[in-house]
Amino acid sequence: MTNSTQTRAKPARISFLDKYIPLWIILAMAFGLFLGRSVSGLSGFLGAMEVGGISLPIALGLLVMMYPPLAKVRYDKTKQIATDKHLMGVSLILNWVVGPALMFALAWLFLPDQPELRTGLIIVGLARCIAMVLVWSDMSCGDREATAVLVAINSVFQVAMFGALGWFYLQVLPSWLGLPTTTAQFSFWSIVTSVLVFLGIPLLAGVFSRIIGEKIKGREWYEQKFLPAISPFALIGLLYTIVLLFSLQGDQIVSQPWAVVRLAIPLVIYFVGMFFISLIASKLSGMNYAKSASVSFTAAGNNFELAIAVSIGTFGATSAQAMAGTIGPLIEIPVLVGLVYAMLWLGPKLFPNDPTLPSSARSTSQIINS
C-alpha cells in the first residue's frame, strides 16, 4: 500500500443520517417555520431564555454540533499547522481583507436605499466564522487540524479587529466614497463572550476528551469506537439549531418576504463568491485538497451568533439590522451544505491524485447518488 493511499481521508461508511443530509435540513427548516407560525408564544418563550444576550437553547444546539468535530482533531499536529505561514497568510487575507470588503460592496450594490438592512449585512460580513465551519470542514473531509487552528486565529482577530473594522466600514470608507455613514458602538464584551461560549467551551471539551480518552483507552479505541459513537451528534445539533432559528424567524420571513429576498440575494452571492475565490486562491497557492477545503469554508462562513448579538445589542432586537443578522444563517446553512457537495464533486477534478482527497468510501458519486 502506498503512502498516498494511507494518508487519504477515510471516513466511516455513510450512515443513514449522513446519506440524506439535504433532506433532513429541508425538513428541519420547514418544521421550524411551522412551529414558529403555529405555536403561539414560542418565539417569546425562546427569546426569554437568554443569559448575557446569548440564547441558551441556540447555544445548546451549537455546542452539541461543534463538540464532535473538535473531539476529532489531533491536537498534537496543530503546532505544525500553526507554523505554516503560507496557510496562515492566505487565510488571514481572505477572512479579514477580502471577506469584509466583498460584503461591503454587495451591501451597497443591492441595498443602497435600505441603510438599516445594509448596516446589518455589513456587520454579518465582519463576523468571521468560528463555529459551523468545523461541521462544513468535517463533512467535506477538510484538514481538521488546519481548520481548528484557523478557527482559533479567527477568534483572536475577532476580539481584536471587530470594533475597528466596524468603524472603518460603517464610517471611514463610506466617507471616503462620499456615501452616508453609520454610527455604531460595538460592545467589546459581547464579542469576547461570543468567542468564549461558542468556541471556548466545545474546544476545551474536545481537547480534554482526546487527552483523557487516549490516556485511558488508547488512540485506536478513541478514534475507532468513541468518535463514531459521538459523530451523529454534530448533525443532530445542526438540525436542532436550524429548527430553532427558523421557528424564531417564522413571522419575519412570512410578514416581510421582500426584505428577506433583498437580503438573500447578496448573501447567496457572498457565500458562493467567497467559497470559490478562496478555493481558487488555495489551489493557485499550492495547497492540497484538505487544506483548500479548510481555508475555503473558513472564509465563506460567518459567525452569525456574534452578528446577531452585536446587532441586537447596538440597534435593538426588533431593528432591521438585527433582522439582517438573523436572516444570515437561514441563507448560509443551506448554501454551505450545497458547497460541501460542490467541494466533494470538484475535488477529484481540481486535485487529481491528491493524497488528501476523500477515499473511495466517501466518493461524491456515493454521497449524491446512494
From Swiss-Prot:
List where the protein spans the membrane.
16-36, 45-65, 92-112, 119-139, 148-168, 188-208, 226-246, 260-280, 304-324, 327-347
What topology in the membrane does the UniProt record assign?
A: Multi-pass membrane protein
Keywords, ordered alphabetically: Arsenical resistance, Cell membrane, Membrane, Transmembrane, Transmembrane helix, Transport
Annotated GO CC locations:
plasma membrane
The chain's Cytoplasmic topological domains, given as residue ranges, are 1-15, 66-91, 140-147, 209-225, 281-303, 348-370
Effect annotated for changing residue 241 to A: Does not affect transport activity
Gene Ontology molecular functions: antimonite transmembrane transporter activity; antiporter activity; arsenite transmembrane transporter activity
Q: What is its main location?
A: membrane
Pfam families in alphabetical order: SBF
Top-rank taxon of the source lineage equals: Bacteria
Subcellular localization, per the record?
Answer: Cell membrane
- Any one of the GO BP annotations: response to arsenic-containing substance
Control of this protein's activity: Inhibited by carbonyl cyanide m-chlorophenylhydrazone (CCCP).
| InterPro entries referenced in this protein's UniProt entry, alphabetically | Arsenical-R_Acr3 (IPR004706), BilAc:Na_symport/Acr3 (IPR002657), Na+/solute_symporter_sf (IPR038770)
Which loops or segments lie on the Extracellular side of the membrane, by the record?
37-44, 113-118, 169-187, 247-259, 325-326
Q: What does this protein do?
A: Catalyzes the proton motive force-dependent arsenite efflux from the cell. Probably functions as an arsenite/H(+) antiporter. Does not transport antimonite.
Which family does the record assign?
Answer: Belongs to the arsenical resistance-3 (ACR3) (TC 2.A.59) family.
Q: What protein name applies here?
A: Arsenical-resistance protein Acr3
